Amino acid sequence: MPRRRVIGQRKILPDPKFKSELLAKFVNILMVDGKKSTAEKIVYTALDSMAEKSGKDHLAIFEEALENVRPAVEVKSRRVGGSTYQVPVEVRPVRRNALAMRWLVEAARKRGEKSMAQRLAAEMLDASENKGTAVKKREDVHRMADANKAFAHYRW
């Protein structure tokens, strides 16, 4: 392993419409096969339809949905003396956002609506109201961490 300096993370340019770095990251996570303009179109259409349905600001709904999906703790496998323990660890802020966005996109892809924009809008509206598949995923992760609280002293 080279002993040179650690290279910092690349800066993501904010999205052109709302000037939000978080939204730009979300577009990148949604993007398939490098088709960024398609991903942007899907996200903006979803945000517009969400704002229309709820009457709130585009970014406010998006932020609220993300906040309700962000995990506080997760479990990591740790091998101790021949057996593997699921050790609960706190999630770093950058990873919190990444996981929340990934879970939102996964949940939206599994929904039954016609277009991806409709699925994404429905999932984000559900998440902003603290329901839906993405929120359930977060609850499952928290439940798993809570169940393995006894192994918290194995943290590294």
Swiss-Prot record:
One of its GO terms (biological process) is translation. InterPro entries: Ribosomal_uS7, Ribosomal_uS7_bac/org-type, Ribosomal_uS7_CS, Ribosomal_uS7_dom, Ribosomal_uS7_dom_sf. One of its GO terms (cellular component) is small ribosomal subunit. Gene3D superfamilies: Ribosomal protein S7 domain. Keywords: Ribonucleoprotein, Ribosomal protein, RNA-binding, rRNA-binding, tRNA-binding. The keyword Disulfide bond does not apply. One of its GO terms (molecular function) is tRNA binding. It holds the Pfam family Ribosomal_S7. The keyword Transmembrane helix does not apply. Part of the 30S ribosomal subunit. Contacts proteins S9 and S11. One of the primary rRNA binding proteins, it binds directly to 16S rRNA where it nucleates assembly of the head domain of the 30S subunit. Is located at the subunit interface close to the decoding center, probably blocks exit of the E-site tRNA. PANTHER family: RIBOSOMAL PROTEIN S7. Belongs to the universal ribosomal protein uS7 family. This is Small ribosomal subunit protein uS7. It comes from Vibrio campbellii (strain ATCC BAA-1116).
